[in-house]
Every structure is written in C-alpha cells, then in structure tokens.
C-alpha cells in the first residue's frame, strides 16, 4: 500500500530531489539549540521522526522520545499520540500500526506530521502502517526534546526534524547505509553525468546548457535534465512575421556556482538588426501549487506540487522553501525587504497589489540557485518578428556568465520566415468565421496609485492580450477610457462579447402570471427597455459601428423557458437598435440548438462534441467552449493542444472563451478555502498581479502558441484553397496535397511543433510555386 501523500513514490517527484536533507534538530545526543526554541519549532505542526527501536518489554515502559508518545501494547501494536496544544479545541492525534513489533528485536519507526497538508503517516520497518484520510490534524503541543527517557529498551539513530519530510528521506535504504533518498540522489547524479559525458557540446565550464521545447508537457524540475533535451549547444528559433516565439534554455550546475546570468548580444541579418533589449529573457520560477497542478483544474488541498509556472526576471522575488513546501513573496518597503508566506492554508490574504510594494525587476537578474551539482534553472527567451521585419536568418550569441566570468557562449539563430501570419485564424469548416480568443472573469487590470500608473497598467494588460491572440475580453469595450487605451495599443475589435444582458421583459410585471400577459404588456415592456438601454445602444453604435457585438443572454441555462421564451423579444430589440448585433448564451448542451437555434447567433458551451459544431456551422454560426480546460493547469502543452489544434481540427470548434485570466489576490494562496471560487476548482489563473502590472506564466505562453498554430494552419488552408484551380499542375497538385494533409490531421495525436514545422514547409512550397507561376 502506497501513501497518498508522504508515502507515495510520486510525491518525491513533486518535491525537489536536488535539496539535501538538513541535519535533524534532535538526535540521541540531544537538541540543537535551546530546548524551548526547539519545542516551539515542532509546535508549528510540521515534523518528522525516524529511529531504530528495540522494546525489551511489552507493553512498553518509558518514552522512546519526549516529543510525542510512541508506545507498544502487550501484543506489539505501536501507538503514536501527538498531544494537542493547550489552546486547541481539537483532540489529541492518535494512530496505530497494523504490523506488530517483537520484544527484544530491532524495528525501524518513522512518523510524519503535517498541518499544512493535513496529513500524517506512520511507517514500521519501511512499510506504511497508517495514513489519515478524514481525521483532522490538530495544532500540536509537543513535549521535551529528549530520547529514551526511562525507556526499557534501546533507541538508536534517532532523528527529528521540524519539517514534514517525504517518505524517501526518513525510510532506510536497502543496505541500511542511508535513506532511500540518498540512493535516488546518487542514481540521479550518476545518470546526469553519463548523459553529459555523452554530449560534451552541452558543457560550458562550470555549467551545462541544453535547450527544450518551451511548450513541452514535461515539467523541468531542478533535479535533472529533461528527457527531450537538445544537447547541440545552440539556440534556434523561427517565427513568421507578426509573431512572438519562445526559446527554452536549461542551465545545470556542474560545480557550485554562486551567481549566474545570461547575456544576449544583438542579432543581425545583413544590415537588419534586432537589439538585444527587444528579446525578453525571463526565468521559469518553480513554486508550490495545490494537488492537481500541471494536469487539471480540480483541486486537492492536501497536496503540494513543485511546479514550473511563473515567468520572472528576479528569482528572489519569490522564495520557495522546497523542503517545507512554502512560498514567500517579497515586499520592498522603504525600511527594507520582507517576505510573506502565501502558502499557509490557515491564513488568508487581505492586502491589495494596488498598494503593496511587490514588483519584479524590468530585466533579467543573476540567480544564486546553482549552488550544488545537478541543480538547474530554466529560462525563456521571447523573440518578436515584427510585421515589417526583414526575413532571413538573424544570428548572435548568448553569453553564459558564472561568478562574474564568461563560462562560454552559445550561438543564437532566429529565422524570420518570408510570410506574415493573419491577425486571427479561422474556422476549419468556414473561413468566414474567425477563431475566437476571448477571456472573461478576470480581476480589474487598472491598478495603480495615480492615473498615469493605472493607464500604464491597463495598456500593459491590453498589449499582452493582443500579443497572445486574445482579442476580446470582458471589462474592455464598454468603458470609453479603456477602449481609447486599446486603440493606442492597436487593438481594434472586429467582434466583441458584451456582458450586458437585458432582463426578461416578463419581470416588469411581477403581479401577473405568464399566461395573463398581453401583447400590450409586451409593447410597453419593449418601449421601457429601449429607453433604459438607449445610452449603451448609442455608445456601441458610435464607438464600434463595424464590429460584431455579441450580447450574452443568460448563463448555463438549458430549460426551454430560459433559452427561448425569455430571449426572443429581447433579441429582436437588440437587433433593431444595435448595428451588427448578435446574441448568444452560455449553455450546458445541445438544447441551445433545439430551443434557441432560430434566435441565437452562435453558442458557448462546455461540450467539445463535433456534432454540436456541425449543427451551428450549418447555420454559418460559430461555436466555442468555455472549459476543458479552464485556465488553471500550468502545463503549456495542455493549453497549446486543447485551445489550438485539438479545438480547431478534432472538435471543429471556433475558438475559446477562457474562464479566468488575471489572479485575484487570494489566488496566490491555492490552499485558502476561497482560492478556487465556486466548485472544487483550482485558481483560474494565467497572469498574476504585481504593483503596476502582472507576471506572465508558461501556460500563458501555451495559449499564445495554441492560437499561433491555428493562424499557421488557417493560412495554409487559405493559400491551398486559392490554388485549387491553378493553371500550373505542380501548384494545383501541391494545393491538393496540402488540403489532404490538413484533412488527415485528427488534431489529437500529432505533436504540435511537428505540425507547425510541416505547415511552414507546405506554405513555403506553395509560395515558391505561386511565384514561379506568376512569372
């Protein structure tokens, strides 16, 4: 039986293998430091105890340790009791072993206790005996930090830490010469050395450097090289014009390095140049997330998973205690820096980033985390191929600076392709339907103490939305000031989803039953509704005369009354009074089609059923989901696949309505009860607030790549379709081959980057043949 938390081998992968186990606070020789301070450390509710014990009497007599009660009854069943704190209203924590000890024989005992994770586990001779499921973990009140007090028997190799260590660190290795963690650690180091010895190009003095696919689904942790690492010793990236593209670099210490950083040169292609300052270098910050991290948007509060997630310039902005599984944010006050724990489930967060001095550096800063062999750090380098960029191969170098000295340089090759991506992709079934990128349910994005700061923050948010192909989001178009800022950034909507909803007219007559309402009542209600909403009808008609304006009518409704009767007259009014007006609803299934297909101009739903897409496309209307996944999973591959190729080809959906983007304050602490909002959900987060702006994440990069995949594939389909009647037989046949290739994609099994590369090659061939025919 494996432990669900501390006993499972999988937990070891969730917590760092690279951090060595610290010295214990208590051994047979006594406590390290003042006894009161040691007791206070254990009373925080996080500790681990391991020892070998021989009971010379059953039932046992005396104390194995004064910290907690460890006894054995007359049958040899071990009992562990953790006394509750005097101020606690909980009961003492008690658990028992399933196996039995024998009098006069040596047995290995190990016990873990964690209030943070609400888990406790008991091991006997390396086997899990108990782990709590529903039993509450009290705030403890431990006793004296002594060993074998008046104990009838012997205790040796006693160790106690004020940390709830995972099982591998407190269980003995098969040879008894260390812990199971020691064995894994040695094997990891040996495997790392073997891989690097076989790939000497990746070695640069005190560090090794490899590259990876930035949207790969493998987590890059701090304890080894990724399985799909590229050891070529070069950074290579390509992008079409009007596209952002990332490169991923992983730096591993071959010897202790006190300080490390990357320095990029300018990139040149003939007379054209990309300044180094235009390439944003950020490190991937690993921190603890709740159970479900990386894979799902459902939460398990008792797990803590070390997860690559945030993109930051300053590693010290967030400190992570990898053994105690805690996250700390840095606040720069006038009188000095302070770090605040944002991972305690028993503490909420009641401050606002509008006023708190929490902000990342503007450029990449040196790191101090490569202090031991095998420790690594992942970096993202974000390149931008502008619309007017000269195509060609831009070359430069990436300098590796370790302890102030150049450890080596890597060649950097950035190829800008000779074509421009369309601003938006289009539906696989209907090129007239644009692939929708919409974000709803985000917090306010105009943070700042002054108007200038608030405007700068808003423009930064609008800019990142545009750069990540999210061209429509709540809270933007209905505000004249924000809309003006969007125009400054160059974000001009061709469609928008408006949160305003006209209430059903029947509510204006609360004293009448539905079957008592008359046509005169309806006319009166419509006149009232038109007057009530005239201002915003005029606003949208004036500000966005050419944009399609989708008005939301009800959310998650599936009854006939809500979907048809309540919407019919309101929809007629909206279409009469607003130019290019559209109506839609959040629905839970196919009933939207049956009940309101004649009213609505598309649908937003949870299902990814291809049949639903076929139905709405038969009317020439769009359909897109707002879930599967929600915004929570940190895995960029999941975001890239589900929001891009899989949506576009496998489900034939027309985009996404992302349910969540910018973190509310409590989202920094995923273990607080309110973090996920309604339902058993994790934080619906892609961006994190800081003073005057926000921090991006690798899953946000995955969203951008999802939409870029669709832009590439839509461009290929448009070019191929246009050449089906080409006079040149080679061009006509190549166009057919491209369309056959697109049709044969199922959107679920292919590697996304492989599809991207193949699409680029087919676009280039079509362009070459078209130019040849034009001559």
Q: Residue locations for each model-derived region?
A:
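Beta-sheet-dominated interaction scaffolds and their linkers
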Residues: 197-254
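Aromatic-lined carbohydrate-binding surfaces of glycoside hydrolases
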Residues: 268, 287-289, 303-308, 313-371, ...
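Short tryptophan-centered beta-strand motifs in secreted/extracellular beta-sheet-rich domains
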Residues: 106-113, 122
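Catalytic-core region of carbohydrate-active enzymes that cleave or remodel glycosidic bonds
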Residues: 597-676
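Extended recognition patches within non-cytosolic domains
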Residues: 21-24, 28-29, 121-123, 154-190
């Amino acid at each position: 039986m494996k432990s669900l938390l501390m006993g499972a081998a999988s937990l070891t992968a969730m917590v760092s293998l690279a951090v060595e186990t610290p010295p214990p606070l208590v051994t047979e020789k006594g406590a390290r430091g003042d006894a009161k301070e040691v007791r206070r450390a254990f009373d925080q509710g996080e500790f681990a105890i391991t020892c070998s014990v021989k009971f010379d009497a059953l039932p046992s007599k005396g104390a194995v340790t004064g910290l907690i009660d460890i006894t054995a009854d007359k049958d040899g069943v071990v009992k562990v009791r953790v006394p509750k704190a005097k101020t606690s209203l909980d009961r003492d924590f008690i658990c028992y072993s399933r196996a039995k000890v024998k009098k006069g024989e040596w047995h290995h005992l190990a016990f873990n206790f964690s209030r943070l994770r609400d888990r406790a586990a008991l091991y006997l001779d390396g086997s899990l005996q108990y782990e709590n499921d529903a039993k509450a973990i009290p705030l403890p009140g431990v006793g004296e930090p002594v060993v074998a007090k008046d104990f009838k028997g012997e205790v040796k190799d006693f160790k106690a830490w004020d940390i709830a260590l995972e099982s591998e660190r407190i269980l003995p290795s098969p040879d008894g010469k260390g812990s199971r963690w020691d064995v894994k650690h040695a094997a990891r180091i040996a495997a790392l050395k073997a891989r690097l010895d076989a790939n000497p190009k990746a070695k640069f003095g005190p560090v090794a450097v490899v590259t990876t696919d930035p949207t790969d689904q493998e987590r890059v942790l701090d304890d080894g090289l990724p399985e799909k690492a590229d050891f070529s010793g070069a950074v290579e990236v390509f992008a079409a014009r009007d596209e952002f593209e990332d490169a991923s670099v992983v730096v591993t210490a071959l010897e202790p390095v006190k300080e490390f950083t990357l320095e990029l040169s300018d990139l040149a292609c003939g007379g054209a140049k990309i300044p180094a300052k235009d390439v944003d270098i950020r490190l991937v910050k690993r921190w603890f997330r709740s159970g479900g991290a990386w894979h799902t948007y459902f939460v398990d509060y008792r797990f803590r998973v070390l997860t690559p997630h945030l993109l930051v310039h300053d590693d010290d902005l967030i400190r992570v205690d990898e053994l105690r599984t805690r996250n700390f944010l840095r606040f720069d006050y006038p009188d000095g820096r302070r770090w605040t724990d944002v991972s305690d489930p028993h503490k909420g967060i009641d401050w606002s980033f509008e006023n708190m001095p929490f902000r990342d550096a503007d450029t990449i800063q040196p790191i101090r985390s490569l202090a031991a062999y095998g420790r690594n750090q992942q970096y993202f380098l974000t390149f931008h191929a502008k619309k007017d960029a000269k195509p060609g191969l831009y070359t430069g170098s990436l300098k590796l600076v370790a302890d102030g000295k150049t450890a080596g340089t890597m060649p950097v090759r950035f190829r800008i392709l000779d074509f421009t991506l369309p601003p938006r992709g289009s539906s696989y079934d209907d090129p007239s339907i644009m692939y929708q990128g919409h974000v709803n349910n985000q917090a306010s994005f105009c943070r700042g103490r002054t108007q200038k700061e608030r405007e700068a923050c808003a423009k930064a948010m609008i800019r990142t939305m545009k750069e990540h192909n999210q061209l429509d989001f709540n809270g933007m178009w209905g505000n004249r000031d924000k809309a003006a800022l969007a125009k400054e950034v160059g974000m001009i909507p061709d469609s928008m989803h408006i949160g305003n909803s006209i209430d059903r007219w029947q509510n204006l007559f609360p004293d009448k039953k539905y079957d008592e309402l008359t046509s005169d009542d309806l006319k009166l209600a419509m006149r009232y509704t038109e007057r009530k909403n005239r201002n915003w009808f005029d606003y949208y008609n004036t500000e966005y005369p050419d944009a399609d304006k989708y008005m939301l009518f009800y959310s998650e409704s599936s009854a006939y009354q809500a979907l048809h009767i309540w919407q019919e007259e309101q929809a007629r009014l909206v279409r009469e009074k607003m130019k290019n007006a559209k109506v839609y609803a959040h629905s839970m299934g196919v009933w939207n089609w049956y009940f309101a297909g004649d009213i609505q101009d598309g649908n937003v739903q949870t299902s990814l059923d291809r049949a639903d897409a076929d139905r709405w496309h038969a009317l020439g209307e769009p359909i897109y989901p707002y879930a599967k996944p929600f915004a929570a999973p940190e895995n960029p591959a999941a975001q890239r696949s589900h929001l891009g190729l899989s949506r576009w080809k496998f489900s034939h959906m027309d985009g996404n309505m992302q349910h969540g983007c910018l973190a509310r304050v409590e989202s920094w602490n995923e273990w607080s009860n309110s973090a996920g909002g309604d339902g058993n959900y994790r934080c619906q987060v892609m961006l994190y607030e800081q003073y005057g702006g926000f921090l991006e994440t690798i899953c946000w990069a995955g969203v951008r790549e999802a939409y870029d995949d669709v832009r590439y594939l839509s461009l290929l389909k448009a070019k191929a379709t246009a050449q089906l009647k080409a006079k040149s037989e080679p061009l006509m046949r190549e166009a057919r081959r491209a369309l056959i290739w697109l049709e044969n994609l199922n959107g679920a099994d292919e590697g996304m980057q492989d599809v991207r590369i193949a699409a680029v090659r087919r676009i280039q061939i079509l362009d070459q043949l078209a130019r040849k025919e034009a001559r």
